[in-house]
């Protein structure tokens, strides 16, 4: 395993890579979902440090209070420290519950076993991830930007631990 020896060079290389992508594709902003975890904190900070227009997005959705609080603190700090950063917060719980209600209504009409159909925790978690992804892309579309992924190498490329068309749905990572 190769160990990183020069973190300043790594930061410079990431900064250059993001800027090269940004200018080559003539985009106008970076959009990063901030969960309150370390991965999104690092990625959002690296994006902020580029000096490019960056939208850091909090998407509370039945989140653990601690994660929402950390996300809130981190994004507010970035917005106050970097002039290029805009903080966005969109509460998604009501949209999620409306969707689940609609699916429940449909399952009743189709005579599905409602408990089996709606009680699948993995499916519900994946739906939350996909709702967040759709929201990030809505912001990116409105701001002529790209969605920057926050997954880490082991999760995304090693064991494939991400939601297809959810947190794995990004433009660059």
Segments predicted by a language model, with ranges:
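ATP-dependent adenylation/nucleotidyltransferase module used to activate substrates
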Residues: 1-163
